[in-house]
A protein has these predicted regions:
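Flexible C-terminal active-site loop/helix
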Residues: 4-15, 31, 292-341
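Active-site beta->alpha loop and helix N-cap motifs at the rims of alpha/beta catalytic domains
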Residues: 115, 134-143, 148, 165, ...
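Active-site mouth loops of central-metabolism enzymes
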Residues: 127-141, 161-162, 193-194, 238
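N-terminal small/glycine-rich loop or linker at the start of catalytic domains
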Residues: 111-136
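Metal- or metallocofactor-binding catalytic centers and their adjacent structured scaffolds
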Residues: 3, 37-112
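Structured beta-strand/loop patches that form or line metal/cofactor-binding pockets in enzymes
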Residues: 1-45, 49-52, 325
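Catalytic core of soluble alpha/beta enzymes
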Residues: 159-292, 296-298, 325-334
């Protein structure tokens, strides 16, 4: 069955509260919804979501890719998705669009043959567990938020750091007292020098904070710095912003720079994300999966990918919970940290 049309539409969401990371503060989120229709009327949906400070993409840049995408895939057979994915590799400047279009193709294909996307990816699991993220905020607000997250049943709590060393130490250490059985993902979003990153980790370790992933402590291009932190930190170190493509992943694996890679469909697209899964599994590097500013429609893509591959030790798929959405549009059910397909 041939693809009849593909259209992009801008969508806009407000955050329930301003979301701050070491790279800046966000109060709203503009995404792009991709709607792909087959000649038999079957519709596949995808969503592109990005943060300019991380990927360099803007909504305007992404919208400009619409005509290019139409020329690449309209009038082509949806069953030949491998051929279409190869063409979409040309969208190097807009990986989030590549992800959304690839997923829309998969969504339409799955509806055609009567399966769900997680089954397309392998059907490894039909249930995953996510963490919940605490942005950079003052100590009092941090602890109030951590207490609520912990009481809501989340076993893994992600805390953003990297803006103020002393305050960040206090926020994480005090959070552990509020949530004594919780495991923590600590994400600096490139906010530290290697020396600071090592010192930060050692202080937390001396306070017996259980950090299961220490995410992107240093600048994304500082691979030597990442490696230095990895070999001098008591915690497993993850690359996030350092890995967009399968080639980035291969380089980090060869350099032995990280324990974990954080895959985001919005950085890699579906096809490169699958390649990174296989690379990491071959090399014994662990995986987590994260998100940008997706609504329930966009986070749905990563949930199906994560459950279907069953490849991830930790899931950070919580962006939709921070956005003021009028309508829930995911093909999943969520109870606290538990996501069911």
């Amino acid at each position: 069955v041939k693809i009849k049309s593909v259209k992009f539409e801008k969508t806009y969401y407000r955050y329930f509260e301003p979301f701050t990371i070491s790279l800046g503060t966000h109060e709203d989120q503009e995404n792009i919804e991709v709607r792909l229709e087959l000649e038999d009327g079957t519709v596949g949906l995808g969503e592109a979501s990005t943060l300019f400070v991380i990927s360099g993409e803007t909504v305007e840049i992404m919208m400009q890719a619409e005509k290019t995408v139409q020329e690449m895939i309209v009038k082509e057979d949806v069953e030949s998705y491998g051929k279409l994915f190869s063409r979409l590799q040309q969208l190097r400047a807009t990986p989030a669009i590549k992800a959304a279009v690839e997923f829309a193709i998969i969504d339409a294909f799955c509806k055609r043959i009567g399966i769900r996307p997680y089954q397309f990816f392998g059907g490894a699991k039909d249930h995953i567990e996510t963490d919940l993220t605490v942005g950079i905020m003052d100590l009092e607000k941090t602890l109030k938020k951590v207490k609520k997250i912990y009481e809501d049943g989340f076993r893994v709590i992600k805390i953003k750091v990297g803006k103020n060393f002393k305050e960040d130490v206090e926020r994480v250490v005090e959070s552990k007292k509020i949530a004594p059985q919780a495991m923590f993902v600590v994400d600096a979003n490139q906010g530290f020098t290697p020396k600071e990153a090592i010192e930060f980790a050692n202080i937390l370790h001396s306070e017996r904070v259980e950090v299961v992933v220490y995410e992107q402590p240093v600048n994304r291009y500082n691979i030597e710095g990442l490696k230095l932190v990895r070999f001098n930190s008591p915690y497993p170190v993850a690359a996030d912003e350092s890995v967009f493509t399968k080639y980035d992943a291969l380089r980090l694996i060869k350099e032995e720079a990280v324990d974990f890679i954080n895959i985001k469909l919005m950085k890699s697209g579906v096809s490169d994300a699958l390649a990174i899964v296989h690379l990491a599994q071959s090399a014994g590097v662990q995986l987590m999966i994260g998100c940008m500013g997706e609504s329930s429609l966009g986070i749905n893509q990563s949930i199906h990918f994560a459950a279907g591959t069953g490849a991830f030790a930790y899931h950070d798929l919580d962006a939709h919970l921070s956005l003021d959405e009028k309508t829930f549009r995911g093909d999943f059910r969520q109870e606290g940290p538990h996501i069911y397909l």
